Amino acid sequence: MIDPGLDGKAVLVVGGTGGIGNGIAHAFLAQGARVHVTGTRDAADDYHDLPASDLDGLEYHRLDVRDNAAVSRLYIGEAPLDVLVNCMGIVRYGRAEYDPEVFAAAVDVNLIGAMRCSMRFHEDLTMTKGSIINVGSASCFIATPGQPAYSASKGGLLTLTKSLADAWGRDGVRVNGIAPGFVDTRLTQRTIGNAEAYDHSLRSIPLRRWGTPAEMGGVVVFLASSQASYLTGQMVIADGGLTLR
């Protein structure tokens, strides 16, 4: 097996308390990294009621990515950060995102939050010649009429990834992303619980199944690894073929 070179590295997964973010956090933990995660609840114990939140072995920090001061104050230890994963994300259903205030709130978390965190750790990542991985969505590439704010914010994350990769390449910082398709998480339970919608989603995926948080974690670990050392500015689509059609 090729060593990804992540043993002992300092990793921060913003939004790593559940779903895709939690899968990513544990993928790094399995490689020997020191993994920090953020969430919005006061303490790690407050996530015990969520079955998909496994915080064992992870260092928890409360963070509201909408708060500039809170992001600036975030401290994960003396060692500089090696890998930043921006996995924050909110979505609203029932056409709620057509409300301009709801739209703005989603953009503030999903897109501006990623920029805030990237700026906060730019100096660290310059020191370590580290990398940023932004968790986008297949919605970066296809229409999502029910969630215009989610798709717009994740689409913005695609171009932010390219812009930061270009701007910070001279600092030795790589910036990439992944664009997951349908993944079984707390955010997608509404679709899973609707038999018609779920069956339709399966028919739209060439692999005929949804992805898992662990599979997304594998892609992110690769992007952060030494095997991807000449890769930057890319958004890797991990969607089972959803966007091929």
What would you call each of these model-derived segments?
Residues G94-V107, S201:
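Substrate-binding pocket helix/loop in short-chain dehydrogenase/reductase
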Residues S137:
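Residue(s) in the substrate-gating loop at a strand-loop-helix junction
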Residues E123, D166-R170, S229:
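Alpha-helical segment proximal to the catalytic Tyr-Lys
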